[in-house]
Amino acid sequence: MKWRSLEESSTGPDIRPLREIYAERKELIAKYVPAETQAVHEQAIAELKSRKLAANILPVGSKAPHFVLPDHDSKAFSSSDAVLNGRRLLFCFIRGRWCPFCVGQMEAMNIILPQIERTGATFVAISPQTVKQSFFMHDQHKLRFPLLSDAGNKVARKFGLTYRVPARQEAVYRRAFVNLPFTNGDDSWELPIPATYILDRNGTVLYASANEDYTERPEPAEIVRVLRDDPGA
């Protein structure tokens, strides 16, 4: 089962909606992944939704916690530096390079990066994977923005995003060679639910979107629209 990149699947200069790309990937999963495996993932998502994690994330209007994290080249990135430089900060929490939906989202953000930067915003992505894994992801997908490593999900936890992978889903991941202890450098089997934040020039949350369903992400066009509609924030 091979995922097509957004550039491979594009029919023109404009980026296709993520929902279309994700629909194609879901079709491949339905075709090639055993039904019992799909059921485990669906149950895990349902359990997360029952806990209402997305409803309890750090909300719009809150002062965002400051963070300093290493990027894919081990260079320190400070959220305060972006704010002090008078730029808004856009960042996505993702699960890792092993997740096709995270990869699709990052490819989409890569395509619209010039539009993001023209609004006067800085974009970074954050995952719990190690710096080495972030380097591999950055290199493989030719990403043009910093990919930060949040060891132990310390920053994601401050935003209310973390959960422990259920035992049955952990077993499925292990069989599929998704080795989170190796990828993330710890044995916690913790992940963040996918989330997207925009901080204004004062470090206050201007936009917040999260979903317990890792197959659902905000459309890149929506994010650019928020940045354009509030240029002075």
Locate the predicted segments by residue.
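Thiol/selenol-based redox catalytic cores and closely related redox-interacting motifs
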Residues: 150-216
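Generic structural signal for well-ordered beta-strand positions
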Residues: 77-78, 206
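A short, polar/charged loop-to-alpha-helix boundary motif
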Residues: 212-230
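Non-catalytic interaction/Regulatory regions outside core domains
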Residues: 1-12, 19, 52, 146-148, ...
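Short active-site neighborhood of thiol/selenol oxidoreductases, capturing the structured segment around
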Residues: 79-109
